[in-house]
Every structure is written in C-alpha cells, then in structure tokens.
Amino acid sequence: MEKLLHVGLDVGSTTVKIVIMDENLNTIYTDYQRHFSDTKNTVCNVLTDLAKKYEDYEFTIALTGSGAMSAANFLDLPFIQEVVSCKRAVEKYIPQTDVVIELGGEDAKIIYFDKSIEQRMNGTCAGGTGAFIDQMASLLHTDPTGLNELAKNHKMIYPIASRCGVFAKTDVQPLLNEGAAKEDIAASIFQAVVNQTISGLACGRPIRGNVAFLGGPLNYLSELRNRFIETLKLEGDAIIIPEEAHLLVAKGAALDSVESSHAITSQKLKSKIEMLRSCMAISNSAEKSREWKNAYQNLIWVMIKKLEMDDSQG
C-alpha cells in the first residue's frame, strides 16, 4: 500500500494556500501564492507540483475558500465550507478561542464560537480588506509591508473612511497635501480597517474572551493586529496569534479531507488536472469552443429528440 498524505487547499479571493500533512497529521509542506484571478490555473499548477513532488504517494484532498467551488467541481474533489474548515482547525490548534477575526484579500469575517457558531462576513465591497490596504499603500508609494513599517512610528490617528477605497482616498489625499506624517496616515489606515470590521460585522455584538487573528493581512502586518488589540482592549492570553495564521483554514481542509475524500494516486490526480486544463482550453478559445460545438451538436440534438420521444404519451 502506498503512503498516504492529506492535502488542504484554501482558494481565496486573491491567493491559493496549500497544506500537506502526513499520516500522523503533521504539516510537512505549505505554499502560499497569489492567483491574480486565475484560480483554476493556479490550482492546477499547485496540484501538479504536488503530484510531481510526492509521486509515490496517495492523497486525500479537500478544497475550501471563496474561490474553490468551481475548481472542486471540475476536479471532482470535495468542497468544504470555509467556516467548517476554520472550525475544524480552531478546535484542533487553538481550542481556547471564543472569537475569530479573519481578513483576506477581498473578504473579512468575524466568527463567534459559542453554543452555536455564528459567522459574519462582508458583502460585495472589499473595503477594510487586504485589497483596501494594497490600494491605500499605493497612495503612500509603498506596499503593505512598507505601510506596516511606517505605522510603527505613528504619533496620532486621523479619521479615515474604510467602507470604500474611493471615500478613503478622499480622506487620505488631503492629509498628504497638508503635510501629515506618513507614519500617522499609515496607522490611521489600519485603524480604519479595524473600525470597518468591528462596526460593519460585529454590528454591536461584543467581541469578548479569547480572540484569534487569522488571514494574510493579520498574519503579516503586526501593526494592524496591534490596532485591533488596542481597540478591543485585549491583554495576555486573550490575544491568540497562531503559527502560520494565514494557513489555518487550509489546515482545516486537510483535516477534513481525512473523512471527506477517498484516497487517489498521483497518476489519478494528474488525469484530473489534465481534464480541467482541457476544459479551460475550450472555454478560453473561441475556435476550440466552436469546434467542440460542431462536433457534439448533432449528438446533443439526437439526445434531445430521443428524450422528447421517450417522454411522449398516447
């Protein structure tokens, strides 16, 4: 019998995360990369690397995240709701958690762990998320990491709207024109994210107890975390910053794959990937799409007529 690995993919709004665990559920490999809106191709590339790297293994695989459903359907692999994967990982790695605050590329969530789990998520607007931070950083001619470094030396906080990047820009640009310190503006941008998350998602429900910070922005931007910690008045053990916080949901998917997925060989995985790539080639090429339609339209028409005859009565 071939050795078995458990794989979780978190396909988010801007990134793909993969976690690979051995049979003892120890993490042996992780990867984190932007997909630039090309989710299926990025998932194919990540899984192709997996099949090559561990050619002599079998895999259980589960996909989760806002961009995972279509890829999971094409690959005929289990799709796990993100809140389920998050719950699974939280219960295993940080069971003392009462509330999760998670920021992604274009989404923000607060998850309350009580007698029942309640998730609150932003709508179509990406205000107060990683994309918002990217946009605001560009106004200061830097990137999110540079924004974080600037915020470490701030002295005051200015009010900045974060519901929409357009509104925020109208607040930030006058501050720049008036000569406000970039350090203060950077910290104010992070505070705007905090305000948007708490007011827009918590909607008056208290954030109490042990709070875990998940997602790429909160994993990499220490000053953003600090704005949350200060605003929520968190201290000591109430502050939970798990190791590899940006990968926790992918870890949950890997754990879920143990029960939700049948093991497949690397060769079978390669076949699934090739099938997805061929479907993508047809959908991306007008010529190939026409060829496919011409090849199958007669067959489809015959099937339709046959169904009509089979369903007829009298």
Language model region names:
Residues 1, 260-314:
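Flexible inter-domain linker/hinge segments
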Residues 2-24, 97-114, 312-314:
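Gly/Thr-rich phosphate-binding beta-strand-loop-beta motif of the actin/hexokinase/Hsp70
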Residues 5-41, 45-48, 119, 123:
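Short glycine-rich, Thr/Ser-proximal phosphate-binding strand/loop in the N-terminal lobe
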Residues 38, 115-156, 164, 246, ...:
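Glycine-rich phosphate-binding loop plus the immediately following alpha-helix
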Residues 67, 203-231, 242-249:
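Glycine-rich phosphate-binding loops at beta-strand->alpha-helix junctions
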Residues 133-135, 241-279:
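Glycine-rich phosphate-binding/hydrolytic loop that grips phosphoryl groups
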Residues 168-199:
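Adenine-nucleotide phosphate-binding core of ATP-dependent small-molecule kinases
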Residues 188-207, 253, 299-306:
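Phosphate/ATP-binding catalytic cores across multiple sugar-kinase/actin-like superfamilies
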